[in-house]
Amino acid sequence: MEGKSLLFKEFAGLDSFPIVLDTQDTEEIIAAIKAIAPTFGGINLEDISAPRCFEIEDRLKAELNIPVMHDDQHGTAVVVLAGLINALKIVEKTLSNVKIVISGPGAAGTAVAKLLSLAGAKNIVLLDSK
């Protein structure tokens, strides 16, 4: 988490620091973040597994007046989209004319599929072992 704070400072000029919670209870996480939110300009959630991550992020976005992002979902999706766009340039293809397969549509895979679709991907397949 400290490393993520360094990246925020280095690449975006944002001052940040990690706050680690010793709970996996959805209500406790939401209450703790809501209590400290007025002192922050944004909240970056990290290492919250699905399906809890969806409810926590959605509720915090609805209840707070600052940006809330679950990095495991959206940070991963942005990196995948950037890499895919650059790879497709090399092979002279576009998102709209390739087949994309995502193995394991958990929190990150689901967010990747949503972002790729918004970016113009037309043929996305999600595979799950269950």
Residue ranges and their predicted role:
Residues 46-53, 74-75, 105-110:
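Gly/Ser/Thr-rich loops at beta-strand to alpha-helix junctions
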Residues 24-27, 74-78:
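A short acidic, often aromatic-flanked loop/helix-cap motif at beta-alpha or helix-coil junctions
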Residues 38-39, 45, 68-69, 116, ...:
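A glycine-rich helix N-cap at a beta->alpha junction
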Residues 1-12, 78-130:
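Glycine-rich phosphate/diphosphate-binding loop of Rossmann-like nucleotide-binding domains
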Residues 1-66:
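N-terminal ligand-binding/catalytic initiation module
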Residues 19, 46, 70, 102-103, ...:
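Active-site-adjacent beta-strand anchor residues
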Residues 63-77:
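Short, acidic/small-residue loops that bind anionic groups at enzyme active sites
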